[in-house]
Amino acid sequence: MIDADGFRANVGIILANTQGQVLWAKRVGHDSWQFPQGGIDEGETPLDAMYRELWEEVGLYPRHVQLLAATDNWLRYRLPKRYIRHGQHPLCIGQKQKWFLLKLDEPNTEHIRFDTAKPEFDHWEWVSYWYPLGQVVHFKRGVYRRALRELARELPLKKELILPETKNHLLQV
């Protein structure tokens, strides 16, 4: 679904373990890594889309995870001009995303799989919470930063989480 401003409605998933690490996945056929994400279908709520994408991209059911939080508002990013398909109608100039923070208990890591009908990822690893900011493609960095900062307070941690840019303590648990 593309809105009147040209932004495609989408969900992003930050899947965290109990150590505060997040699932970081490599796209099939590319040397690029990202969080699971995907479009919202017609008539679907962002929450429904998130659970569908969780299954389609990572092989997890709602029973495998605990929903901790979601961003309050849509977070937007514009696509670089070279990625805009000018012959497409309606024209998509970027994405607007609702982000969800989920907790995966360690016993459920065995359920993570990519052998789905249309695999989008072929490898995954647990990385530190802020690691994706320096690794994701440049045009998504602002959205990743806003989503990670907004959702960080909901992480169930046994240690401090420090903002990468400032070295300030974000929270102490």
From Swiss-Prot:
A molecular function (GO) term: pyrophosphatase activity
Family matches, as InterPro entries: Nudix_hydrolase (IPR020476), NUDIX_hydrolase-like_dom_sf (IPR015797), NUDIX_hydrolase_CS (IPR020084), NUDIX_hydrolase_dom (IPR000086), RppH (IPR022927)
E.C. number(s) listed in UniProt: 3.6.1.-
Coiled-coil region: none
Keyword entries, A-Z: Hydrolase
Hydrolase among keywords: yes
Source taxon at top rank: Bacteria
Homology family: Belongs to the Nudix hydrolase family. RppH subfamily.
Listed Pfam families: NUDIX
Domain Nudix hydrolase positions: 6-149
Protein task: Accelerates the degradation of transcripts by removing pyrophosphate from the 5'-end of triphosphorylated RNA, leading to a more labile monophosphorylated state that can stimulate subsequent ribonuclease cleavage.
Gene name in the database record: rppH
Short motif Nudix box, span: 38-59
HAMAP family reported for this sequence: Nudix_RppH
Protein name: RNA pyrophosphohydrolase
Required co-factors: a divalent metal cation
